[in-house]
Amino acid sequence: MNPEEFKQALAQHEIALTAKQLAQFALYFQLLVTTNKQFNLTTITAEPEVYLKHFYDSLTPAFYVPALRDQPLTICDVGAGAGFPSIPLKIAFPQLQVTIVDSLNKRINFLNDLVQQLGLTGVKTFHDRAETFAGKKSAHRESYDIATARAVARLSVLSELCLPLVKIGGQMIALKAANASTETAEGTYAVQQLGGQIVQDEAFSLPVTADPRHIIVIDKKKPSPKRYPRKPGTPAKQPLTAPM
């Protein structure tokens, strides 16, 4: 997928990118590839793959959650890595207010430089573990309209990291690959324990490669119990599962 095909593929979903936005994506690609030579940000570095599997893929939540397109939502991106999905969403929909949390300082430094070079405003970054960022004494707890995560962990783990950040009436959006149906079944208990309810599981395929993808949308129905998230590392080692 080259930049023109990227533009056309999004236009099919009624997302129209301006020349400025396309230039921002082009610069994003250059900065990503250049920095990746210094330390590992991604294994995907060829332009067609970056545009498809990073940029296009990051924008797919807007296909199924229309409010992302025109509402000034506050979004927390948990474990954003090289900025996915939040930076592509911010480029395409500038009204979004983005907060990024990542545990590796090198990635945060890259993101700070990226935001400056792209001329983006309304983006904050935090070097922190998701477990402490969403802790019971954190000012960020239950303060965001949306929490997003892409390929960070299984849904049973992700929900413990993300749902405590989402305000009542807000949503968690998980971007998943082929095994999402199994994850959804396994993760339902954790989602419910954390005050959420799975309301959408949208299955689709990426253009060109037909790689399977899922967008899972979870509504925040009630407060997350203060005992969650547990201490750093525990959610991954001991995911919340239904008692046998």
Swiss-Prot record:
<feature type="binding site">
    <location>
        <begin position="130"/>
        <end position="131"/>
    </location>
    <ligand>
        <name>S-adenosyl-L-methionine</name>
    </ligand>
</feature>
<dbReference type="GO" id="GO:0005829">
    <property type="term" value="C:cytosol"/>
</dbReference>
<keyword id="KW-0489">Methyltransferase</keyword>
<keyword id="KW-0963">Cytoplasm</keyword>
<keyword id="KW-0808">Transferase</keyword>
<dbReference type="Pfam" id="PF02527">
    <property type="entry name" value="GidB"/>
</dbReference>
<feature type="binding site">
    <location>
        <position position="84"/>
    </location>
    <ligand>
        <name>S-adenosyl-L-methionine</name>
    </ligand>
</feature>
<feature type="binding site">
    <location>
        <position position="150"/>
    </location>
    <ligand>
        <name>S-adenosyl-L-methionine</name>
    </ligand>
</feature>
<comment type="function">
    <text>Specifically methylates the N7 position of a guanine in 16S rRNA.</text>
</comment>
<comment type="similarity">
    <text>Belongs to the methyltransferase superfamily. RNA methyltransferase RsmG family.</text>
</comment>
<dbReference type="GO" id="GO:0070043">
    <property type="term" value="F:rRNA (guanine-N7-)-methyltransferase activity"/>
</dbReference>
<feature type="binding site">
    <location>
        <position position="79"/>
    </location>
    <ligand>
        <name>S-adenosyl-L-methionine</name>
    </ligand>
</feature>
<dbReference type="InterPro" id="IPR003682">
    <property type="entry name" value="rRNA_ssu_MeTfrase_G"/>
</dbReference>
<protein>
    <recommendedName>
        <fullName>Ribosomal RNA small subunit methyltransferase G</fullName>
        <ecNumber>2.1.1.-</ecNumber>
    </recommendedName>
</protein>
<keyword id="KW-0949">S-adenosyl-L-methionine</keyword>
<feature type="region of interest" description="Disordered">
    <location>
        <begin position="221"/>
        <end position="244"/>
    </location>
</feature>
<keyword id="KW-0698">rRNA processing</keyword>
<dbReference type="InterPro" id="IPR029063">
    <property type="entry name" value="SAM-dependent_MTases_sf"/>
</dbReference>
